[in-house]
From Swiss-Prot:
Residues 76-89 have a biased composition (Acidic residues). Residues 1-89 are annotated as: Disordered. Belongs to the Speedy/Ringo family. One of its GO terms (molecular function) is protein kinase binding. This is Speedy protein E6.
Amino acid sequence: MDRTETRFRKRGQITGKITTSRQPHPQNEQSPQRSTSGYPLQEVVDDEMLGPSAPGVDPSPPCRSLGWKRKREWSDESEEEPEKELAPEPEETWVVEMLCGLKMKLKQQRVSSILPEHHKDFNSQLAPGVDPSPPHRSFCWKRKMEWWDESEESLEEEPRKVLAPEPEEIWVAEMLCGLKMKLKRRRVSLVLPEHHEAFNRLLEDPVIKRFLAWDKDLRVSDKYLLAMVIAYFSRAGFPSWQYQRIHFFLALYLANDMEEDDEDSKQNIFHFLYRKNRSRIPLLRKRWFQLGHSMNPRARKNRSRIPLLRKRRFQLYRSTNPRARKNRSRIPLLRKHRFQLYRSMNSRARKNRSQIVLFQKRRFHFFCSMSCRAWVSPEELEEIQAYDPEHWVWARDRAHLS
């Protein structure tokens, strides 16, 4: 039989080729044995399309030989290998880690190549009795969340260390109103046990004992004024052994100036401090007035105007009194008489006057050592009294007198 050859083209490529040497016999189609003529049967069949055969040829596909099967298996393996090679590798992406105001911090994160199909295959291999439902959160996700929580805590702790409060002032919760909390700033008390010991030591002084025993009406030395004395000791900053009787009366006099307006009662402090010598009281008042002007910042600015005011006052006096010109010659004589009067005073009076000057100087230094802070809050007074509530001094309450 003549040899036939057919070629088919599809999409510009050769898709198959059929070459037959002879017409197949119906018996040869059923078995892959060799033909009786001794020539082997050769055929090449395309997998996608078969060409038409000659008339009288069976259109059923011939039996595939063992070599074709091996070729088909090899082709399937070769097709699977490029699929494995072309599997998408995990890519690296940039994700937003945190937002800081208008700045955005990016973090490089590797995209996981785990797909839901992998979870299904894993669940199918589990032993019976194990829940095959896919977990909602993987172990890697939990680790990521734990790391994220730790990073947030560390970021929150850093500003707290920077915004730490000063030791002198603290904020305490005063009251709670529903979801709102009212905060009140309270100054930490600087009173130490050493100041209480110095105060108790001065109470044993005989002059101070007589003074406290005399003040039965508690006009000058009630428990709040005495607590202010301890507060002034703490603010002055002197060593505990340095506080003497004069410091006690200075602090008590200053406390009366802040809380009381009774000038007559404060005069008794001078009586017990200087005993019967009252010649020093007017000078003490003068020094106290000068101290008040020295504490006022406006008074310090106006001190430069004092000579000008004196000059204008003298000019006004001369314009109203025509005899002032004649009396001007008597000024040196008046100064001479004043000096003689001072010399006629006894030595004790001159000594007391020098002591008063020293007292005023010490009082000024004592007030400056407190940084000019003479006001004491009621909370601080209560803390001072709570240090030793059984002390006999705290029983000096004016409410018990009525």
